[in-house]
């Protein structure tokens, strides 16, 4: 491979294995504890995000937490998703995935739920399967595969979506989605 075809990206890559069947169907003990004791979860999440990205402990816990968060989303367990999100989160879905009548940014848990209802109306079985995480310190870039079938047409959809999460005090304060990897890397500050 020639040198000009190699793209150097900073950050720590974490390859993800698929979530277990059990995790896909129900909450794990640590998820139940996080929901029951959100203040404790926030303290631990903040401590985790303060570890250096190359820390083995950070990589292991982040891999588990990312798999759990996506499994919770895929099983429609919103409480398990929101435990890791700031109440004032800003969510920016990919512009080319949104119809023109919906706003470009959604704010707070209520804004996310409004968008979630839109996705559920459009796709009966929409899901996101995380494949890789790029740990950038206070941000994570997660490569996912979005899958589903159109509610009216039944047409299958499967495409990559890159989700950039920004953290503060261990909680997600911003999520941006991209269909294009280059745009996601640029938004993460990794390309000029």
Where are these regions (language model features)?
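C-terminal and inter-domain tail/linker signature
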Residues: 1-192
């Amino acid at each position: 491979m020639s040198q000009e075809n190699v793209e150097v990206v900073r950050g720590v890559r974490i390859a993800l294995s698929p979530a277990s069947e059990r995790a896909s169907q129900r909450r794990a003990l640590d998820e139940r504890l996080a929901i029951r004791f959100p203040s404790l979860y926030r303290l631990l999440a903040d401590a985790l995000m303060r570890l250096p990205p190359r820390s083995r402990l950070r990589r292991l816990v982040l891999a588990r937490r990312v798999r759990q968060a996506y499994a919770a989303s895929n099983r429609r367990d919103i409480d398990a998703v929101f435990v890791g999100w700031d109440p004032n989160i800003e969510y920016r879905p990919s512009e080319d995935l949104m119809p023109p009548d919906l706003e470009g940014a959604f704010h707070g848990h209520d804004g996310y739920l409004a968008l979630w209802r839109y996705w559920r109306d459009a796709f009966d079985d929409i899901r996101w399967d995380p494949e890789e995480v790029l740990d950038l310190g206070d941000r994570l870039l997660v490569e996912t595969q979005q899958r589903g079938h159109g509610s009216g047409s039944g047409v299958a959809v499967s495409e990559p979506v890159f989700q950039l999460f920004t953290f503060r005090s261990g909680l997600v304060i911003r999520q941006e989605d991209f269909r294009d990897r280059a745009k996601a890397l640029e938004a993460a500050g990794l390309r000029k």
